[in-house]
Design a protein with these regions (language model features):
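Surface-exposed loop/turn motifs in large extracellular/passenger domains
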Residues: 1-232
Length: 232
């Protein structure tokens, strides 16, 4: 199946309180998935988001993206999409910071298990959420499963930002553990090819571990490749 040629001009927000759940918000799609017997590769292509997308949920996994909140299948393709809206993760649940709570934030897709090609982000991407781990990028917060990110751009006016004060959990003294920030991808388990970052990456919070980069904050599998990319 395909979703193409759609334009969103409205603001989108999610604010769930659901411990142990996954909550996703996107300008066009919250979650993009397909069944194993669905036939051809599923595609989201040539869609545009102009609205602000905000996720302030207190959940196990928070996903927010300008076009797609979460792409959860390796055969799902996102291509030729544009985000012009602001993307925000701003959960304030300080006293519930626990291990294995994840925050994925991206200009095009928050959490991505499929390929992304030819996409452009023009909007600011930011997180002020208190989650154990945050992955945030101008195009995608995280890319799983050896997928390829090809020919994508985070433009000049787009800033990728994390900012909060370090606070201890009153119940078990847990703190925010790690952040990966990238101009294109926050954390990548695949290949990034011919992508460009022209925006600013600004890490202004205080977790235990920080990885920040113009193209990618953290490449999880050293066997995967980055080639032909430019941080301008």
């Amino acid at each position: 199946g395909r979703i193409s040629g759609c334009v969103n001009n409205g603001d989108v927000s999610a604010a769930a309180q659901a411990s142990g759940k996954v909550v996703c918000a996107g300008g066009v799609l919250g979650t993009f998935d397909r069944s194993d017997d669905a036939g051809d590769t599923a595609e989201v292509h040539s869609n545009t988001n102009n609205g602000t997308v905000t996720n302030s949920s207190d959940v196990k996994t928070l996903c927010v993206g300008g076009v797609v909140g979460r792409s959860s299948n390796g055969t799902c393709v996102i291509r030729d999409c544009i985000n012009k809206g602001t993307v925000v993760s701003n959960s304030t649940a300080v006293n519930k910071v626990q291990a294995n709570r994840s925050n994925f934030v991206g200009g095009v897709s928050g959490q991505n298990s499929g390929s992304i090609s030819g996409c452009t982000n023009h909007g600011d991407v930011s997180s002020t959420s208190y989650y154990w781990e945050t992955r945030i990028g101008g195009v995608a917060g995280t890319v799983f499963g050896g997928q390829r990110i090809i020919g994508c751009t985070n433009e000049t006016e787009a800033t990728v930002t994390t900012k909060y004060e370090r606070k201890f959990n009153s119940e078990n003294a847990a703190v925010v553990d790690q952040e990966h920030l990238g101009g294109v991808i926050g954390q990548c388990e695949g290949s990034i090819v011919d992508c460009t970052n022209r925006g600013t990456v600004d890490q202004a919070s205080d977790p235990r571990t920080v990885n920040a980069g113009g193209i990618c904050g953290f490449v999880r599998n050293a066997a995967e490749s980055l080639s032909g990319n430019a941080n301008e």
